[in-house]
C-alpha cells in the first residue's frame, strides 16, 4: 500500500510541477493570467484522481466555463468593477452579493448538467468579486484548462494511468431527504 501512495505522490509531484511550469511560462509569454489560483486545485485533481469524473477535462472545462460566465454576469449585474480590490471599494456589499448569487447559480448549473468540478467554484468567486474579469481573463482561464488537460494527458500517457477526456456523467447523486 505504501508503494501505491509513493507512486501517487510522485505522479502528483511531477504532474503538478510540470503543469504549473508550462502554464506559468505561457502566462509570461502571452502576458495573460493563465496561472490563476483555481488552476492549481484543478491540477491537483488531474494528477491525484485522474479517473474521477470531477477530474476529467470535460468537467474541468465546462465547470470553469460555467463559473467564469456566471461570475461575469453576476459582477456585471451588480456593478462589480473588474480588477478592483472589492474590500476597499465604496460598496463592497456588491461583491459579496455577486459572489453569493454567482456561486449558487454556478453550483446548481454544474450539478444540473453533471459537470461538477470543485475548483470551478473558486473561479466563480474570483470572477464574481472582480479579481479577474473581461474577455481576455475569461479566455486565459479556459486556455489554462486546455493546457492543463494536454499536460495531464501527456503525463498520464507516460505513467500508464488512464485519463479519460470525456468521462461519463457519474458524479454521485446527493441523497434525497
Regions of interest found by a model, annotated:
Residues 23, 106, 124:
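Generic structural marker for isolated residues within well-ordered, non-membrane alpha-helices
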Residues 51-60, 109-120:
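Membrane-helix interface "capping/anchor" motifs
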Residues 75, 109-113, 122-129:
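Generic transmembrane alpha-helix signature in multi-pass membrane proteins
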Residues 101, 105:
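Membrane-embedded alpha-helical segments that form the functional core of polytopic membrane enzymes
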Residues 88-91, 106-112:
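Short acidic, glycine/Ser/Thr-rich loop/turn "cap" segments at secondary-structure junctions
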Residues 35-40, 117-123:
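Transmembrane helix boundary and interhelical junction motifs in multipass membrane proteins
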Residues 114-122, 159-164:
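Juxtamembrane/interfacial segments flanking transmembrane helices
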Residues 1-81, 86, 90-96, 100, ...:
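Alpha-helical transmembrane segments and their membrane-interface boundaries
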Amino acid at each position: 500500500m505504501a508503494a501505491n501512495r509513493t507512486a501517487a505522490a510522485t505522479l502528483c509531484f511531477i504532474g503538478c510541477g510540470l503543469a504549473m511550469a508550462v502554464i506559468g511560462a505561457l502566462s509570461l509569454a502571452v502576458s495573460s493570467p493563465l496561472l490563476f489560483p483555481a488552476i492549481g486545485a484543478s491540477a491537483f485533481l488531474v494528477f491525484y484522481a485522474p479517473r474521477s469524473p470531477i477530474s476529467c477535462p470535460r468537467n474541468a472545462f465546462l465547470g470553469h466555463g460555467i463559473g467564469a460566465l456566471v461570475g461575469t454576469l453576476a459582477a456585471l449585474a451588480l456593478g462589480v468593477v473588474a480588477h478592483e480590490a472589492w474590500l476597499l471599494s465604496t460598496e463592497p456589499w456588491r461583491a459579496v452579493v455577486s459572489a453569493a448569487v454567482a456561486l449558487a447559480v454556478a453550483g446548481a448549473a454544474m450539478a444540473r448538467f453533471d459537470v461538477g468540478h470543485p475548483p470551478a467554484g473558486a473561479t466563480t468567486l474570483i470572477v464574481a468579486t472582480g479579481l479577474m474579469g473581461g474577455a481576455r481573463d475569461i479566455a486565459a482561464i479556459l486556455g489554462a484548462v486546455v493546457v492543463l488537460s494536454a499536460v495531464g494527458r501527456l503525463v498520464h500517457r507516460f505513467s500508464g494511468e488512464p485519463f479519460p477526456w470525456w468521462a461519463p456523467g457519474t458524479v454521485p447523486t446527493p441523497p434525497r431527504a
